Structures are given as C-alpha cells and as structure tokens.
Amino acid sequence: EMSASLVGSEMCIRDSYYDAEKAPYDALLNEYERGVDTQQLDVFFDTLRKGLVPLIRAIGEKPQIDDSFLHLEYPVEQQKAFADYLMEVMGLDRGHCGLGETEHPFTLEFNNKDVRITTNYDLHNVASSMYSVLHEGGHALYELGIRDDLQYTCLTGGVSMGVHESQSRFYENLIGRSRAFIGAIYPKVQEFFPAQLGNVTAEQFYRAVNKVEPLSLIHI
C-alpha cells in the first residue's frame, strides 16, 4: 500500500508539471480510464445523483424487507461448497481458475490459462461470499476469454477498469440478483443450507438479496 501511495504521489506531481491547470487526480484517473477526466465524471455523477438520491429516499420510506435469515449462522465449510457450485454454474474451469480466501475479495490474472479469484466467508452473512464469488467470477471470465494472440499486450488485463467492472457487476447484479437466476439455483442453495433456508421461499430470498438500504457496503 505504501509503494502504491508513493507511485500515486509521484504521478500527481509529474502530471502537475505537464499541465499545471489540470486537477492532480486526473493523473491517476488516466491510468485506469484513459481519456476520461474529472470534469467528465462530475457531469456523469451529477446526472446519476439527480435520479438515484430521490429513488433511494423513496425506497427507504417503504416497509423494510426481512432479510434476517441471511444473517443466521452459515458454517464456512458449507459456504465453501456453495462457492464451488457457483463457479460451476458460471462455467469457470477449475483447471484454469482457482478460488482462495482473503479479507477483501480480488482477482489475480497471470494469463488466459491461469486466473485466480478470492472471497471472504462471513459466518453470519451468506450473501457476502455468494456475491463476491459472482463478482470476482465475472472478472475471471473476462480474463479467461482474452484471445491467445493478445496475451502480454496492452489489451490483456482489460482495456479499462470501467470495462472490467462492467463484467463483474453484470454477473454479480444483473444476473446474480435476478429473479430468474435465483429461481434456477435456489433448490440447490437450499440443499447447501437446509437448516437456514428450508422454510424460506425463492421469492423471499430474491427480495432479501435485493434489499436496498441508505447506507450499505458495495460488497463486504
């Protein structure tokens, strides 16, 4: 972390020499989203804020969804087996994609034959590891899908951070939190956690994992 901080500081200083009028953060931003600057993002996020803030407030005034069953005790070994199942559902070849455990989930790619993802198992929040696996699995599928002739070029590792995140969030949210996906996998989910979810319907589970709160973490 210290070395990354020093590199970031050096980049900000370097960029200030190139263009003293430019915001220092643009030096770092350009490393991840080439051609995008803070002025463009200010317009983008201002537009989002106008729609999202009232929406979140309106949802907050509605009756709260019961997600208490997600916070029962879920043994880690069962969560690990469930994570393996999710990787299988996603089509991740375990011969080319490993799964490890860490404090904060991340994906590490060496090439399109060796990508490794990690997750964190919360004893009292089964959705945490579930959606971390789907999220990091999305990153992994992107890396595993890069053509052989593009390996070790500037196009490997993702063309931008935004594009990479679009793939991970697609699997995590658009697929993983959809009613169709939950309905398809839920009988298997109940097999992994019969004591916790045996009397919980697929619709209840779907609503619980889509619960919106004013202040909530992105992942864990």
Enumerate the predicted regions with their spans.
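Single conserved hydrophobic/aromatic residue that forms the stacking wall/gate
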Residues: 2-13, 218-219
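Contiguous, non-catalytic segments that form substrate-binding/exosite surfaces or channel walls
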Residues: 9-10, 14-126
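Inter-helical turn/loop segments and adjacent helix faces that build the functional surface
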Residues: 35, 58-67, 147-153, 177-186
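Short acidic (Asp/Glu) and glycine-rich catalytic loops that position anionic groups and cofactors
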Residues: 61-62, 113, 145-152, 207-215
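Active-site recognition of the HExxH zinc-binding catalytic motif
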Residues: 131-144, 165-169
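Post-HEXXH active-site segment of zinc metalloproteases
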Residues: 143-166
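Post-HExxH zinc-binding segment in Zn-dependent metallohydrolases
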Residues: 158-195
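Long, amphipathic alpha-helical stalk/connector segments used for oligomerization, subunit docking
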Residues: 180-217
